[in-house]
Regions:
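The beta1-alpha1 cofactor-binding region of Rossmann-like NAD(H)/NADP(H)-dependent oxidoreductases
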Residues: 39-50, 126
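Short loop/turn segments at strand-loop or loop-helix junctions that form parts
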Residues: 2-6, 65-71, 150-154
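"Short basic amphipathic alpha-helical interaction patches in structured regions
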Residues: 13-15, 51, 78-83
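Conserved beta-strand segments of alpha/beta enzyme cores
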Residues: 33-35, 189-191
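Conserved NAD(P)H cofactor-binding loop of Rossmann-fold oxidoreductase domains
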Residues: 39-41, 66-81, 87-108
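Catalytic loop of short-chain dehydrogenase/reductase
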Residues: 8-12, 86-188, 194-214
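Glycine-rich phosphate-binding loop and adjoining beta1-alpha1-beta2 segment
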Residues: 2-33
Length: 214
């Protein structure tokens, strides 16, 4: 599942659209199943479409990888929350790599309000992950020994103020808590994979972190 902009005839598609289309093409050429659903993974409509696709093409699945980086999320009750990339406690200043002109300068990150932290947890935390797993479980499209994994990152102390101790860190902590809830309440083994830092479209948007990763 992706949420990417296709070409409209006047503008090219987003990079992610081409990457995913190429992956699907190469997989099919090798005889490996791959199908892309383009839409808002937070929405009930995409969840339902995914369930129907699994039923039609695969029957059941034994692994679900949950990896979403998004600026906003509309919850089932219709409320839209927006995530922020800020520190918590007090303002944080450090060197930053500006990818627009490849220059290095100082960057100050303001401290988030309590409401901004809560909103970021709503978007980037584990609530939607749990909704996904419950929906898949209820639809009987998970194999008996199915498991699910979500990704997290800790990083070095240099990145703590903006990541581990920042708003996105609060969301990742919620993700860890949700893994236990999914395992106990949904009945699906849920794991968190803590990985190294990678330069991606999502990670490049985090202030200060790109300089550390480079």
């Amino acid at each position: 599942i992706m949420f990417e902009r296709p070409s409209n005839g006047r503008k090219t598609a987003s990079p992610g659209w081409y990457n995913t289309a190429s992956f699907e093409q190469f997989a099919n050429e090798e005889g490996v199943y791959a199908k892309t659903i383009n839409g808002d993974a937070f929405s009930k409509e995409i969840k339902n479409l995914t369930i129907e696709t699994i039923k039609k093409d695969l029957g059941k699945v034994d692994l679900v990888v949950y990896s979403l980086a998004a600026p906003r999320r509309t919850t089932p009750d219709g409320v839209t929350y927006r995530s922020v990339l800020k520190t918590t406690g007090e303002e944080f200043t450090n060197k930053n790599l500006n990818l627009k002109d490849n220059s290095i300068g100082m960057k100050s990150i303001p401290a988030a309000t309590e409401e901004e932290v809560e909103a970021t947890v709503k978007v980037m935390g584990g609530e939607d992950w749990k909704l996904w797993m419950q929906a898949l479980k209820d639809a009987d499209v998970l194999s008996e020994d199915a498991s699910t994994v979500a990704y997290s990152y800790i990083g070095s102390e240099l990145t703590y103020p903006i990541y581990f101790e920042g708003t996105i860190g609060a969301a990742k902590k919620h993700l860890h808590q949700t893994a236990d809830e999914i395992t106990k309440e949904v009945g699906v083994k849920a794991l968190i994979s803590v990985n190294k830092g990678l330069v991606t479209q999502a990670s490049a948007a985090i202030p200060i972190v790109p300089l550390y990763m480079s």
